Amino acid sequence: MMTRKRPLALLILDGWGYRENTQKNAVFHANTPVLDQLTAKYPNSLISGSGIDVGLPDGQMGNSEVGHINIGSGRIVYQELTRISKAIDDGEFDTNPTLIKAIDDAIKADAAVHIMGLLSPGGVHSHQDHIEAMCRLSVKRGAKKVYLHAFLDGRDTPPRSAKPGLAHFEELFKTLGTGQVASLIGRYYAMDRDNRWDRVSQAYELITEGKGLHQATSAVEGIEAAYTRDENDEFVGSTAIPDAQGNIIKLEDNDALIFMNFRADRARQITRSFINADFDGFKRAVTPKINFVMLTEYAADIKAAIAYPSSDLVNTLGETLQNRDLTQLRISETEKYAHVTFFFNGGKEEPFKGEDRILVQSPKVATYDLQPEMSSVELTDKLVEAIESTQYDVIICNYPNGDMVGHTGNFDAAVKACEAVDSCIGRIVEALEKVGGECLITADHGNAEQMTDESTGQAHTAHTSELVPLIYVGRDAEIEKGGRLSDLAPTMLTLMGQEVPAEMTGRSIIQLKE
């Protein structure tokens, strides 16, 4: 007979920060009776999910990938942004053998170096400083044909903020004496992660064939035309920029294609379209034989050169639970499924022994403000069922609403998103109480608590650096001040009466009173 387990659940409310300022603060304005009651009744605190507390540069807003890696590993993990920026500052970037080989092979073949990535100072998926370093390195090594394919942000940055960056790169290429911005497209198309291949195909055609919905003579002209069409950065339609002689720029055999995004989840689909022989997401008119470089490893099954391979994280929470014969469930919607599995497990794709996974499909809508509750009801149905089954020691669940709806900049929809999650939490807490379980409620980073950019008056669609809540729904206890995301795994193990592995440098911040 199966032993009844009293689960410890970790509920991660994605994009749910705490902000003193209540103006356009969807978390504050939402009617959240369940969380209000839990906060009044149970120990709670605010913890940090940004900057140096999660291995990012000081003051850098947190994000879902970084948050889940820190939570799952129980230690501060120095992020790719920090690691690559440091390599550039130290001069090590210019000696990276993978990057050098790609550039030099292209030069030898009289071929071009194509650089693509999210041209943004956002620091979530990429950083434009890294892209600049790549352009400079290519020219320094003697490349005569250097082409930049710019994916535009407007999601981790204000909705219309791409123009200064594009102008900067046009000036940079003038200074370098060679190179140009060859194409523009919004990240909505190039960086889809939900198998919407009709979007990705537009970016693929633009880069491989030079085919765009629009043409422009310069990047600045291209972005100005997009704004005239009322397209924000994220949604800029594919725009080809021919060279000075009017020739279409396209990816050809022997060219290097260097992808400068360091975050994996939104880099995988487009990468597979370039390098997988058996790719079937859409029909490719051409498949040039290129040297493709990923800045970091996007997935174990993508066979391409990696400039900065990841270092292994051992004894993460998932691995520790496996080693102690404890059972665990990971559950979320499509949008955050990779976060509660791959990222939470420190970049490991395979589930651990005793780890079950439930994926609930996110709704197929253009943007989530059209359905702010997303699939939260179905997710909660499955989660309640899992709790009542009493077969799991630990349950990790992510509700994407605060983040995914927060990114749309739609305040009213973000309020509805928070309200939907609140009612779900009520059902979960009730189910846990029935089986003698407990839960920690927290967030990976802020977003929905700031829906307007006070300096510009534009919608605020990015994450924030605000602290995030932590509520312990369980025994009589106190939560220490000054916690951070990396303290959650050690805290959970301690609550379960388990020893914390030495690799976890976070600390247990909940002291039981009994």
UniProtKB/Swiss-Prot annotation:
Cysteine-cysteine disulfides: none
Transmembrane segments: none
An example Gene Ontology CC term for this record: cytosol
Keyword hit for Manganese: yes
Family annotation (Pfam families): iPGM_N (PF06415), Metalloenzyme (PF01676)
Residues of the active site: 64 (phosphoserine intermediate)
Signal sequence annotation: none
Keywords carried by this UniProt record: Glycolysis, Isomerase, Manganese, Metal-binding
CDD domains assigned to the protein according to its UniProt record, in alphabetical order: iPGM
Entry EC number(s): 5.4.2.12
Sequence similarity: Belongs to the BPG-independent phosphoglycerate mutase family.
The protein's role, per its UniProt record: Catalyzes the interconversion of 2-phosphoglycerate and 3-phosphoglycerate.
Protein name listed in UniProt: 2,3-bisphosphoglycerate-independent phosphoglycerate mutase
Source species: Shewanella halifaxensis (strain HAW-EB4)
Encoding gene (name): gpmI
